[in-house]
């Protein structure tokens, strides 16, 4: 799975919810830096824990982030 694809899906799903990066970070209990790096594709190896936290914050499945 391409990191840019994860970032693209993350950005799309976040926009659909109308959430800011700050809100996702807060809901996911992650640092803003982690969230920004994931969405921009800079984070080359997001852990399943990070992906799960993001998915839960967006109320979607991890599969939705990976599609």
Language-model regions, residue ranges each:
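A short, Lys/Arg-rich alpha-helix, primarily the initiator
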Residues: 1-16
